[in-house]
């Protein structure tokens, strides 16, 4: 997956020039109908949302039309300018609709395992047990970085099993991850099952992750960040994770979430697409990279 994204970046860089990010004029106000108000940053809470929808409210947003990047596929895109506290959103209704995170959950599965001491920044290789998978890159020992890049399910399933339900529930609740519903089973609660999250929440979580709002070990935050590295591009350093959800043998849910670091700013983003068969992590990453080159 990483190779596909890097190749797409090179193709776009070859024919697209940089364009300035649109300027915003309003002041950000993010309010949730709970007892707690975080004036310094956007936040989320399960009490303010239903299982299927996240109630995101903010004045400092700009709606943009990116339909040409989706080629008829239903989807949404959220970009958060962390330096200026600004949002750009395509398809606001879908940006708050919660769907399965699929492999994007691995960002936090790895982080929780680090916090639990199951793996460490310096020691995170796990041995392949010999099970033959249809994806060749899974059929080998994995580190946190290679497992993230190869999206090796077995690696993160092992981490979750060792972390265990009680700790996982505690961590997901602590960071406010979507609906925090792990009832679908420890092996696949994240794969078109019970755990759901919206693109808007994905972006907020990434911002919280980079600021280490949760007070985790900074070394663990850095280890996950390093594992998410994709490439140095002409517009900045790109980090991210794809996700693909399938139903009845067809790819119906595609994710690409991550952040782009420039010399002066960090942009967190999430792209999700829904389709009867054409949505995938690779399609989402291709669209997101193209959008980033257009906007930044």
Regions found by a protein language model. Give the residues of each.
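Hydrophobic topogenic segments
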Residues: 1-50
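Short, well-structured active-site flanking segments
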Residues: 115-131, 217-221
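Active-site SXXK
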Residues: 98-123, 147, 202, 269
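Acidic helix-start/capping segments at beta-turn-to-alpha-helix junctions
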Residues: 124-140, 146, 163-164
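Short N-terminal helix-loop-first-beta-strand/juxtamembrane motif that initiates sensory/input modules
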Residues: 71-81
């Amino acid at each position: 997956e990483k190779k596909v994204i890097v190749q797409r970046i090179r193709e776009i860089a070859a024919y697209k020039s940089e364009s300035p990010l649109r300027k915003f004029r309003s002041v950000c106000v993010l309010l949730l109908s709970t007892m707690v108000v975080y004036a310094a940053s956007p936040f989320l809470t399960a009490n303010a949302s239903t299982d299927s929808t996240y109630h995101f409210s903010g004045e400092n947003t700009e709606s943009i039309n990116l339909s040409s990047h989706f080629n008829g596929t239903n989807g949404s895109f959220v970009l958060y300018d962390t330096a200026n506290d600004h949002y750009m959103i395509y398809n606001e209704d879908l940006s708050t609709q919660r769907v399965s995170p699929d492999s994007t959950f691995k960002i936090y599965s790895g982080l929780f395992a680090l916090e639990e001491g199951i793996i460490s920044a310096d020691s995170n290789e796990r041995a392949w047990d010999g099970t033959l998978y249809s994806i060749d890159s899974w059929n080998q020992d994995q580190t946190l970085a290679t497992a993230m890049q190869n999206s090796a399910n077995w690696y993160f399933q092992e981490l979750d099993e060792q972390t265990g339900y009680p700790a996982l529930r505690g961590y997901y609740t602590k960071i406010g991850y979507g609906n925090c519903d792990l009832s679908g089973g420890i092996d696949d609660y994240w794969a078109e099952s019970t755990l759901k999250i919206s693109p808007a929440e994905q972006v907020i979580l990434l911002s919280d992750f980079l600021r280490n709002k949760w007070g985790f070990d900074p070394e663990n935050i850095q280890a996950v960040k390093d594992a998410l590295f994709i490439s140095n591009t002409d517009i900045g350093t790109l980090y991210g994770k794809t996700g693909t959800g399938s139903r009845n043998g067809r790819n119906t849910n595609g994710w690409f979430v991550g952040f782009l670091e420039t010399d002066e700013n960090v942009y967190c983003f999430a792209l999700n697409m829904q389709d009867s068969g054409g949505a995938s992590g690779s399609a989402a990453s291709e669209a997101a990279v193209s959008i980033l080159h257009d906007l930044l």
